[in-house]
């Protein structure tokens, strides 16, 4: 009789982000993505939001000591192979998380969350400089959308030709790679991944589905999953783009506003 194969621990991925009570974005989206992509997801909660398909009705930041304690609890015992950051609403939180990332031997995917899908501010204006000077320099990959690029760099992207300029402005703050998400532009969904020397253009047809809540969180988490598996940044980003495109295609209505992408779309295939 053949002995049973012992269980193998999956790649370990940690999200440092806020909670979305509606389950579409934030740590809920992150953990669903991590499970769907075959990794073990862990979380450090930075804020609690009252949020649904119509927007954010309230947000409460957790104390820095609570964030630090959660992070140390996970990293010092279990360990991590990649970290993803999301909502960090204050300068103090940004600087604390940047310090923690700098002391962790794992790639970091930084999603510099500035506003929600509905336009609700999730980052204090006083924290912008800390994102620029403390958080972005410790990022393996930074994944801003066009609104966040403008918020952080002042560069406005009106068409695809502006994406290189946006990437250069983000890279000037120190991340190893910048993934500029051009999903808000007209035409195909075009993203640019670059480290300043090599470029990777990622294109997908624009999908006729308004239910896209959680897209940014999902993409950044999917990239982190790829990095935790040992993939290079370009390979991880390309796989993440494919996963998110499928999730948007399967996005479903929820409540009276914008529904979420379907994180489990590939599980039934």
From Swiss-Prot:
Q: List the disulfide bonds.
A: none
- Looking at the record's lineage, which domain of life comes first? Bacteria
What pathway does this protein act in?
Answer: Cofactor biosynthesis; thiamine diphosphate biosynthesis; 4-amino-2-methyl-5-diphosphomethylpyrimidine from 5-amino-1-(5-phospho-D-ribosyl)imidazole: step 2/3; Cofactor biosynthesis; thiamine diphosphate biosynthesis; 4-amino-2-methyl-5-diphosphomethylpyrimidine from 5-amino-1-(5-phospho-D-ribosyl)imidazole: step 3/3
Quote the catalytic activity from the record: 4-amino-5-hydroxymethyl-2-methylpyrimidine + ATP = 4-amino-2-methyl-5-(phosphooxymethyl)pyrimidine + ADP + H(+); 4-amino-2-methyl-5-(phosphooxymethyl)pyrimidine + ATP = 4-amino-2-methyl-5-(diphosphooxymethyl)pyrimidine + ADP
SUPFAM superfamilies reported in the protein's UniProt record: Ribokinase-like (SSF53613)
**Any one Gene Ontology biological process term?**
thiamine diphosphate biosynthetic process
Alphabetic keyword roster: ATP-binding, Kinase, Nucleotide-binding, Thiamine biosynthesis, Transferase
Reported EC number(s) for this entry are 2.7.1.49, 2.7.4.7
* Example GO molecular function: ATP binding
Q: Which GO terms describe its cellular component?
A: cytosol
In this chain, 4-amino-5-hydroxymethyl-2-methylpyrimidine is annotated as bound at 51
Q: Which NCBIfam families does this UniProt record tie to the protein?
A: HMP-P_kinase
Q: Which family does it belong to?
A: Belongs to the ThiD family.
Task of the protein: Catalyzes the phosphorylation of hydroxymethylpyrimidine phosphate (HMP-P) to HMP-PP, and of HMP to HMP-P.
* PANTHER family linked to this entry: HYDROXYMETHYLPYRIMIDINE_PHOSPHOMETHYLPYRIMIDINE KINASE THI20-RELATED, PHOSPHOMETHYLPYRIMIDINE KINASE
Question: Which protein, by its recorded name, is this?
Answer: Hydroxymethylpyrimidine/phosphomethylpyrimidine kinase
């Amino acid at each position: 009789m053949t002995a049973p194969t012992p269980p193998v621990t999956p790649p370990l991925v940690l999200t440092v982000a806020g909670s979305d009570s509606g389950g579409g974005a934030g740590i809920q989206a992150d953990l669903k993505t991590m499970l769907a992509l075959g990794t073990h997801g862990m979380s450090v909660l930075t804020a609690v939001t009252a949020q649904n398909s119509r927007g954010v009705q309230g947000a409460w930041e957790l104390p820095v000591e609570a964030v630090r304690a959660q992070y140390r609890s996970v990293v010092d015992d279990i360990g991590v192979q990649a970290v993803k950051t999301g909502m960090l609403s204050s300068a103090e939180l940004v600087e604390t998380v940047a310090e923690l990332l700098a002391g962790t031997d794992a790639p970091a995917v930084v999603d510099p969350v500035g506003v929600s899908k509905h336009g609700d501010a999730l980052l204090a204006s006083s924290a912008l400089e800390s994102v620029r000077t403390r958080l972005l320099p410790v990022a393996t990959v930074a994944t801003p959308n066009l609104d966040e690029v403008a918020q952080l760099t002042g560069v406005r992207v009106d068409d695809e030709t502006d994406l290189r300029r946006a990437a250069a402005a983000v890279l000037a703050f120190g991340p190893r790679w910048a993934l500029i998400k051009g999903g808000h532009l007209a035409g195909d969904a075009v993203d640019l991944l670059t480290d300043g020397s090599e470029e990777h253009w990622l294109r997908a047809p624009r999908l006729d589905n308004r239910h896209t809540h959680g897209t940014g969180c999902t993409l950044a988490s999917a990239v982190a999953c790829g990095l935790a598996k040992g993939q290079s940044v370009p390979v991880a980003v390309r796989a993440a783009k494919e996963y998110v495109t499928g999730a948007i295609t399967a996005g479903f209505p929820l409540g009276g506003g914008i529904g979420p992408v379907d994180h489990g779309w590939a599980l039934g295939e």
